[in-house]
Curated annotation (Swiss-Prot):
UniProt subcellular location: Membrane
Keywords linked to the UniProt accession: Membrane, Transmembrane, Transmembrane helix
Membrane topology reported for the UniProt record: Single-pass membrane protein
GO cellular component: membrane
Protein name per the record: Uncharacterized protein YwnC
Source species of the chain: Bacillus subtilis (strain 168)
Major subcellular location class: membrane
Length: 127
């Protein structure tokens, strides 16, 4: 990649990474607050989003520094923080899928219990 294209790409990563990181943090805070009202464990996905947003912002900052003056240390830090961001997103995805599966299972269990209760109750007797 030629230096001019790389510089434009790094500037784009810096701008969009900062904006997206801020949005991750805001959405994570909203998710954590809404989840904390129901159960403490409900705040976990929000906390994971906040941490992901922080890593994305750090990666964006290093991309901006790398665009200004190309240093190997900035490149290493940018990639390290981006790797952490991707890992946190993977953990968040796994947690979300697990919670969704548990919610679906609980829904069907309660549905079956409700149907079973309706089958064996004697409230609708005919005369």
């Amino acid at each position: 990649m030629n230096p001019e294209t790389m510089n434009k790409t790094l500037i784009s990563i810096s701008k969009w990474g900062k904006a997206t990181g801020i949005l991750f943090i805001i959405m994570g805070a909203i998710t954590a607050l809404s989840g904390a009202f129901f159960f403490l464990i409900g705040a976990v996905p929000g906390v994971l989003q906040i941490i992901s947003g922080i890593f994305l912002m750090r990666s964006a900052r290093e991309a901006g520094q790398m665009a200004e003056h190309n240093s190997g240390q900035s490149e290493d830090l940018m990639l390290e923080n981006y790797a952490k961001f991707v890992k946190m997103q993977g953990i968040y995805l796994i947690v979300s899928i697990a919670v969704s599966i548990l919610a679906i299972i609980a829904f069907f269990i309660f549905l079956m219990l409700g149907i079973a209760d309706g089958l064996f109750s004697d409230t609708y007797s005919t005369y």
